[in-house]
C-alpha cells in the first residue's frame, strides 16, 4: 500500500494539470507559431515557465486505483500487476481467465 501523501500529491497534480491544460496549450501554440513576432513568442515562453511545475501533464504518475502502487500498472485496468492477479484469481475481473494447461 502506498503512502496516502503520495497518492494525494498525485491526485493534486492531476487536478492542476486538468485545470491548466487549455492555458498551457494556448501558450505552446503561440511559442510554436513562427509567424508571430519573436517578442510575443518569448513572452509566452516566460509565462509558460512561470506556471507551476505540477500543472504539467508529465508530472502525473500512473498509479494503481486499489493500492496506489506506482510501478507495473496496466493502463486498461488501472491496476497494478499484484492487484490484478489477486482480483483475477477471485474472478472479479470480467474477461480475465487464469491460464492452465
Curated annotation (Swiss-Prot):
State the Gene Ontology terms under molecular function. rRNA binding; structural constituent of ribosome
**Keyword RNA-binding appears in the UniProt entry:** yes
Cellular component GO terms held in the UniProt record: cytoplasm; small ribosomal subunit
Query: Is this entry keyworded Lyase?
Result: no
Xref: InterPro entries: Ribosomal_uS14, Ribosomal_uS14_bac/plastid
From the UniProt entry, list the residue stretches annotated as the region Disordered. 1-23
Q: Where is the composition biased (Basic and acidic residues)?
A: 1-10
Q: Where is the composition biased (Basic residues)?
A: 11-23
Q: Which GO terms describe its biological process?
A: translation
The UniProt subunit note reads as follows:
Part of the 30S ribosomal subunit. Contacts proteins S3 and S10.
The protein's name is Small ribosomal subunit protein uS14
Q: What lineage does UniProt assign to this protein's organism?
A: Bacteria, Pseudomonadati, Pseudomonadota, Alphaproteobacteria, Hyphomicrobiales
